[in-house]
Amino acid sequence: MKGKYRGCDIEVERCGAEFLTFAVFDNGYEVTSGFSDSSDTVRDYFSYMNSVVDDYKEHPEDYE
């Protein structure tokens, strides 16, 4: 699933039954990326990534 939130590009995908991969980009800059051993749905994890973007926008120094 790909989308935009507060100007950032968010990507969340399910890789097999066990893992979710995720990435957040702001103007081509990778804010965060990785994987999670989660049973959450892609849509639920995408919503969680919105809170990560909110934190990044409030505290960009924490993501340098």
Regions found by a protein language model. Give the residues of each.
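Mixed-charge, Lys/Arg-enriched low-complexity segments
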Residues: Y29-E64
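Short N-terminal "domain-start" leader segments
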Residues: M1-E18
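Short aromatic-glycine-(Arg/Gly/Cys) micro-motifs in beta-strand/loop hairpins
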Residues: R14-V31
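Hydrophobic aliphatic residue packing
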Residues: I10-V12, V24, V53
